[in-house]
Amino acid sequence: MNFERVKREEADTVLKLYRSLLGTPYCVWTEEYPSEKEVEFDLSRDALFCMRDDAGNIAGVISIDDDPNVECLTCWSETMVPSAEVSRVGVCQEFQNQGIAGKLLKGVMEELKKRGYQAVHLLVAKDNVKALRSYDKLNFENVGEC
């Protein structure tokens, strides 16, 4: 598996991956979100990454988000700046439970370090035990609920 930036011509593949996860356990996404708009926004900022299998297929995706509504939450550390939001983590169902989410998180954190970020934050549904387990393994700290 390799961590790479998603190519612009793969936008439809990413959107199909998002759609394939609708209705699965712990997924709070809808038909309206994430949409082509979010995929294009992420691609325009070189902020959409993936894990690829040995055949080059996308196994999972992750993005670096830029949402002012999330940035203004008061729970984030004011000493760890600049910080970035990690968002839209999704793993194809056939690749789930193989550590792909953890690899995506590690890869994006390395990318953020190269870009000069000091910290990472994210939002997750409090009942999404699979995601919470991945974040716990990487020593993420729960700083609040909203």
For every predicted segment, state its role.
Residues 8, 21-88, 92, 105-106:
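Acetyl-CoA-dependent GNAT
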Residues 9-13, 34, 129-130:
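Short alpha-helical
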Residues 2-16:
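A short beta-loop-alpha structural element at the N-terminal edge
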Residues 19, 136-146:
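Conserved acetyl-CoA-binding loop of GNAT-fold acetyltransferases
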